[in-house]
Amino acid sequence: MKVAVLGAGAWGTALAGHLAARHDTLLWARDAALIAGLQARHENSRYLDGIALPDALRYDADLGAALAHGAADDALCVIAAPVAGLRTLCHAMRDAGCVPAHVVWVCKGFEADTHLLPHQVIAAELPEQHSNGVLSGPSFAREVGQSLPVALTVASTSAECRERTLAAFHHGAMRIYTGDDVVGVEVGGAVKNVLAIATGIADGLGLGLNARAALITRGLAEMSRLGVALGGRAETFTGLTGLGDLILTATGDLSRNRTVGLQLAAGRTLNDILGALGHVAEGVRCAQAVLAIARAQSIEMPITEAVCGVLFDGIAPRDAVSGLLRRDARAE
């Protein structure tokens, strides 16, 4: 199978390396210098340093060439751009006059200004594209790059997209499950990043494992309420792309969103934290969108509200936690 991966960040690079072990894979990035480095060293020293990439993996800064590769009869196009760059990439794909027939994306979050999920952006920008879906689940790019075991879910209303994604990814240490709840999978992937900031704050304040467990459990309730209101199915949120992804992101030391929370608890400013990270922390980008959507739907999301207060309203992390503890008692 031919596979084109659009986006050479940490996740796109790790997935491309996995795919190249079995398929004719091409990794695209618009940054010619990044592509030149990949070609010379077979390592993404900028985003995934220390991970050797397969010799068979090919690289290109020409979007047209990448799209042509992913548009072959027996091919798949994987969009690994962040949500913030998804619409721009769709524009470029359309302008190139070559939209692959089968597309799966791996980005997580809501578009900041429109509050749209990725599948809604795809539908608006590539209306002729119908065989598409989302690949998501509990996964750190570095561990995938190291060929450690991982389980992901592809959700699509297209059986052909599900089957093609399964054929591309389900090998080696990667197990793929299939489903059709695109909304539920996308909401889980977006909200868990915000909740991971909350658990990072609690851990950074030394509040203990009991507090972490409470935040994860009550955070899952927030995620599920929002997801069901937007059209997802409740059972999706107890699966890999809901609870599974939340546990990993809220507790794993490789989690950028958890790191943001830890550093906020240590008294660092958000600007300093993001500057030092050097990578995207999607929870920061989409926290306000999640809260705005919840309020528009009249859905109570107190943990998300507390995170937004710390990130954007100058509320001290300890005061935000105290506010959660002062909430009225209620039935679970």
Curated annotation (Swiss-Prot):
Reaction equations catalysed: sn-glycerol 3-phosphate + NAD(+) = dihydroxyacetone phosphate + NADH + H(+); sn-glycerol 3-phosphate + NADP(+) = dihydroxyacetone phosphate + NADPH + H(+)
Protein residues bound to NADPH: W11, R30, K108, A141, R256, V280, E282
A Pfam family matched in the record: NAD_Gly3P_dh_C
Annotated catalytic residues: K192
Enzyme class, spelled out: oxidoreductase
GO MF, any single term: NAD binding
Amino-acid positions noted as binding sn-glycerol 3-phosphate in the UniProt annotation, renumbered to this chain: K108, G137, S139, K192, D245, S255, R256, N257
Pathway: Membrane lipid metabolism; glycerophospholipid metabolism
Entry-linked InterPro entries: 6-PGluconate_DH-like_C_sf (IPR008927), 6PGD_dom2 (IPR013328), G3P_DH_NAD-dep (IPR006168), G3P_DH_NAD-dep_C (IPR006109), G3P_DH_NAD-dep_N (IPR011128), NAD(P)-bd_dom_sf (IPR036291)
Subcellular location: Cytoplasm
Superkingdom field: Bacteria
EC number of this enzyme: 1.1.1.94
Keywords: Cytoplasm, Lipid biosynthesis, Lipid metabolism, NAD, NADP, Nucleotide-binding, Oxidoreductase, Phospholipid biosynthesis, Phospholipid metabolism
SUPFAM superfamilies xref list: 6-phosphogluconate dehydrogenase C-terminal domain-like (SSF48179), NAD(P)-binding Rossmann-fold domains (SSF51735)
Principal location class: cytoplasm
UniProt-listed GO biological process terms: carbohydrate metabolic process; glycerol-3-phosphate biosynthetic process; glycerol-3-phosphate catabolic process; glycerophospholipid metabolic process; phospholipid biosynthetic process
Protein task: Catalyzes the reduction of the glycolytic intermediate dihydroxyacetone phosphate (DHAP) to sn-glycerol 3-phosphate (G3P), the key precursor for phospholipid synthesis.
Family: Belongs to the NAD-dependent glycerol-3-phosphate dehydrogenase family.
Protein name as it appears in the record: Glycerol-3-phosphate dehydrogenase [NAD(P)+]
Species of origin: Burkholderia lata (strain ATCC 17760 / DSM 23089 / LMG 22485 / NCIMB 9086 / R18194 / 383)
Upper lineage: Bacteria, Pseudomonadati, Pseudomonadota, Betaproteobacteria, Burkholderiales
Protein encoded by which gene: gpsA
